Each structure stands twice: as structure tokens, then as C-alpha cells.
Amino acid sequence: MSDSLAGNGMRQNLNRSSTSSNHTGHAQNGRAPQDPLVDAGHFIKQLACQVQSLACLKWLSELQILACIPLEGSRPLHDVAELANVPASQLSRVVRIVATIGFLNEPDPGHIAHTALSAQFVVDFSLFDSILFLLTTVVPCSMQMSTLTQRHGSAFPTNDGAYRIAFNTSQSFDAACVEGSRLRREWLAYKSNTTIVDETIADVLLRQDWHSLGHVKVVDACAQSTDFGNSLAERCSTLRVVVQLDTATTNGHSEIDSSMSRGRAVIQRRPQGTRQMVEDAAVCILKIEAPSTTIRARVTAELLAHLEVLRNNESAVLIVAAPLLPEPGTVSTSAEASARSSDLTTLQLSNSPQLELDRLIDIVENVPNARDSLKVVQRILFRNGMVAAIEVRYRASSEDQFATPAGTIDW
């Protein structure tokens, strides 16, 4: 009897173990299931699924299969395969894997229908341009990152890059975009669809409380156009706005084009890095719209160019707006991952990494001939919490960073 009870108990334990294993799908050999976040096998499987999903999206795009599926209702799989001239068996496999990520579905066996996600790709061609750019340009370049490092070691290459290695060319990515309309179109679509902020630096600056400043002069230094300056002047009539266009912006012409002169802002020409001529400015704005290999030199030159204005008027502010990476923990994990992915992409394509905030602060506070004089006193944020710009003032070295002393612009 005892043997029978022991056997029944053993069978019950085995049944419980089997049931537990079936429910979790992970418990094997008596081991507890692992957290997916630390399960290396799960991590690799997820990567494999993402790779195949990307490949399937490219397949669907290049064979124009989505256009064969009605936006409303469904269509038999064999009809879609016949219309697109693809094997029905392969189409079925592709549909079933992308269905796991919410792209297409199979409402009834043997029928294909759009989801809310896949339908967007039918009406917005820039979405597939983004996918194609990711697969045909970003992926090949990213795979050459190690080759580039092995070739140059710790030195930062200025005339070489992952793009040139991936496509075996001496042409830079920027030059290739100028020559190739398709590459340029795909790149612009990719940038638009991977941005993690839904507003521009100009949007952030325009929503500040400029009315609180009263009748002061604001300079948009090294501007690429008059758009921001005119918008600011129209929004706040008490400001006297000066837009300083770089020589390159006006193509070296001595006269400002009439289309640039429209609006309330006063237009001037000032080459980058030359002394700021508006000595009574309360606010000077330096907007760096895109990452650049020369960003340190450019910011340093502009800080020196504005040093006299800031020194002579300690309540004056220089706003430095540049593409900055989010500080760890300040935004959601997905937003930070997207921002850092974008940073690596621009680095691999054109050797133009984005700046970390502490790096920009280091540039500001270690300007030659101005050390311990220029301080970052304020941060201007995007709505998602990322830093859009910093405010720089001429201050005594004993004053606290990020404090707002009397007389300072406080948005």
C-alpha cells in the first residue's frame, strides 16, 4: 500500500510539474522560469523575430502586396498571391509572422485583411521609404561600425566612415543625398518617422514667455532663414528682433533678398564666429539645427564672439540650442532608446554624433580666454522632458550653476 501511495504521489507531482511547465513554457529540468529581461535565449529570439519582420516588410513593400489587399474587408490569400505573382505558401508565412506584430491579419483561414497599422502604409508612402532606408542604408552602415573602429583605433576619423565602408565609396553620405533623389527622399522620411519629439527647437523657443522681457532687443544669431525671427517679432510686438544671416545663407551677396526682408524683424549679415555687433542685446540665440563634426568649434567661436556683449551686460543671455541626447532616466526607456539609435545612425552615416548635455556644458564653461566666466544658468525643455537648449550668462565663478539670480530671464 505504501508503494502504491508513493507511486500515486509521484505521479501527482509529475502531473503538477507537467502542468506548470505547460503554463510557463520555460521551466525545464526543475529550473524556475527566467525573467524575459534577463533571459539571454529570449533576447536572441526577440532579435531574430525583429530581423525577420523587417525582411518581410521589405518583401511586402517591394512586391507591392499591400495594394492588393482592400482597406476594408478581406481578400482570399490565393487571390492576393495571384495578383502579386508570388507563391501563396510564402505569402502565408510572411502574413503570419507580421501578424504577430499587428501588421496585417488573417480574420478567417485563407483570407488576408489590413490592420489599422498596415493600412497606414498604403496611404502614406513615406512609411515604406523609412523601412527601405532602414534596411538598405542603416543596417549595412551599422554592420561596419566595428570595421571602422578596427581601422582607426581610438582616433576619430574625419575622412572615413561606416557609410563609405559599407558602400565602398569615397563619396560622403551628404554628397550622395545631394546627387540621389531617392536616397534623399528616404532619408528625410526616416528622420521624420523616427524623431522622438513632436516639436522643433523653434517651437520650444516661441512658446517661452517673451512678453515678460518688455522692450528689449533679441538677436537670432547665425540664422538659416528669417522664419523664426519674423514669427517671434509677430508674436511679441514689444521685442526688437534682429535676424543675423550667415554669409553662406545669402550666397555671398551684398544685399539681402527681398523675400528674406519681409516681416517685422531687422535683417543683418554676420559671418559665423565674428564679433557680435549688437552690443545692447538682452538675448542672443544660437540654433544648431543638425549634428555636426564641427559643433565644438562652432559653439566655441560663437561664445567668444558674444563674450563682450555678455561681459558688458551681465543680465544678457545667450541661448544655445543644439540636438542633445537625453540624460539617462529623464525620459522613458523607449524614448531614450530611439534617441540613442538616432545618434548612432547619424554617427555611422556622416560622422556627426549628437551631444550629451554634460559635453555641451563642458564646451561652454571651458572656452579659451573665458574660463570660469561663462556659466549655464537654465535649461529649456521639450514637452517630453528632453533638454532643447541651455541659457548661458557671464557670471562670477562662485555663483551656483542652474540658479536664477536677480535680473536673469526667468521663463
UniProtKB/Swiss-Prot annotation:
Induction: Expression is positively regulated by the transcriptional regulator wor1. Expression is down-regulated during biotrophic growth within tomato leaves. The expression is induced at later stages of infection when conidiophores emerge from the plant and produce conidia. One of its GO terms (cellular component) is nucleus. It is found in: Nucleus. Residues 47-117 form the HTH iclR-type domain. GO terms for molecular function: DNA binding. Residues 1-32 are annotated as: Disordered. It comes from the Eukaryota. The keyword Ubl conjugation does not apply. Transmembrane segments: none annotated. InterPro entries: SAM-dependent_MTases_sf, WH-like_DNA-bd_sf, WH_DNA-bd_sf. Residues 1-27 have a biased composition (Polar residues). Residues 77-96 bind DNA. Keywords: DNA-binding, Nucleus, Transcription, Transcription regulation. Transcriptional coactivator; part of the gene cluster that mediates the biosynthesis of cladofulvin, a conidial pigment not required for virulence but that plays a role in fitness and resistance to environmental stresses including UV light and low-temperature stress. With claE, coregulates the production of cladofulvin. This is Cladofulvin cluster transcriptional coactivator claA.
